[in-house]
């Protein structure tokens, strides 16, 4: 009977292991939707590229995109930034149509394939910019969330509009377009910050910090918070310091974390694994 008892225990443990791996697989198969938001001139596009490059170097399958897109509706929106903004309702409609195409053609297929999708702007920008023009922030938020997949995390890079306009003029050598006027930026920033207070998915970062500091913070947050929640065993039934899947090379999160640490400088490594 003792032998039978041990056999049953072994079977039970094997089933538990299979069950746990099934949970992990089903959770990670969706992919991760990561969004960067903020007013113009915050350095979002640079940070999107840096994060995408780092994750790709660690072996993750990454899709990098932006809104407005380069599709027909996105091109119309971009053209209006220089030629004169569309009427508020028409502009919102163009953003909705552009986003629907973006979701159908890229975002949803990428997530269903288990990829990390990183976006430079998403529907939060519509809530902030078009909400500021139309004055119906809550209605726009409801409209956008009715068809757009919820992101796993939103990195909001916050900066004073005066500083952002100086960056646009000095760094880009450009004259601010119709979306980059001080009044519009102030109103959008206020809405962004309000959204950050209400939505736990939004993590706010200080855009006044150096590019390297922001990059390091973003990588740490993504790997040790977002990715960990999606792929790590610790929240299920073990401890990192004594984790058998990690020690045996079966923990996706631990492997990615170590791979990133191996590819980064010593300063990044210290921040990443501390």
Short names for language-model regions:
Residues 60-146:
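ATP-dependent small-molecule kinase phosphotransfer cores
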Residues 22-23, 52, 162-242, 253-264, ...:
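NTP-dependent small-molecule kinase module
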Residues 5-14, 19-21, 25-26, 259, ...:
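Low-acidity, Ser/Thr- and Arg-rich intrinsically disordered low-complexity segments
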Residues 44:
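Conserved lysine of the Walker
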Residues 36:
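Hydrophobic anchor at the beta1->P-loop junction of P-loop NTPases
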Residues 39:
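P-loop (Walker A) phosphate-binding loop of NTP-binding proteins
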Residues 126-190:
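A glycine- and Lys/Arg-enriched "phosphate-lid" helix/loop adjacent to the NTP-binding pocket
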Residues 47:
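Hydrophobic positions on the alpha1 helix immediately C-terminal to the Walker A/P-loop
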């Amino acid at each position: 009977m003792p032998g039978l008892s041990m056999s049953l225990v072994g079977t039970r443990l094997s089933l538990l292991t299979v069950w746990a791996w099934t949970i992990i697989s089903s959770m990670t198969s969706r992919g991760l939707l990561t969004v960067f938001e903020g007013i113009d001139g915050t350095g979002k596009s640079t940070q999107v590229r840096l994060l995408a490059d780092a994750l790709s170097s660690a072996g993750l399958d990454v899709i990098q995109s932006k809104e407005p897109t380069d599709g027909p509706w996105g091109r119309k929106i971009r053209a209006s930034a220089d030629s004169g903004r569309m009427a508020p309702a028409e502009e919102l409609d163009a953003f909705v149509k552009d986003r629907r195409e973006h979701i159908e053609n890229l975002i949803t297929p990428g997530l269903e394939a288990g990829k990390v999708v990183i976006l430079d702007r998403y529907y939060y920008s519509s809530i902030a910019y078009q909400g500021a023009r139309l004055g119906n922030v809550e209605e726009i938020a409801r409209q956008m969330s009715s068809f757009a997949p919820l992101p796993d995390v939103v990195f909001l890079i916050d900066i004073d509009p005066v500083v952002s306009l100086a960056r646009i003029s000095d760094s880009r050598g450009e004259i601010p377009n119709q979306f980059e006027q001080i009044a519009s930026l102030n109103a959008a920033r206020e809405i962004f910050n309000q959204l950050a207070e209400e939505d736990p998915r939004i993590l706010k970062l200080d855009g006044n910090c150096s590019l390297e500091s922001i990059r390091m913070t973003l990588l740490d947050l993504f790997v040790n918070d977002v990715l960990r929640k999606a792929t790590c065993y610790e929240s299920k039934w073990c401890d990192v310091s004594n984790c058998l899947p990690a020690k045996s090379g079966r923990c996706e999160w631990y492997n990615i974390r170590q791979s990133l640490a191996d590819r980064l400088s010593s300063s990044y490594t210290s921040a990443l694994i501390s």
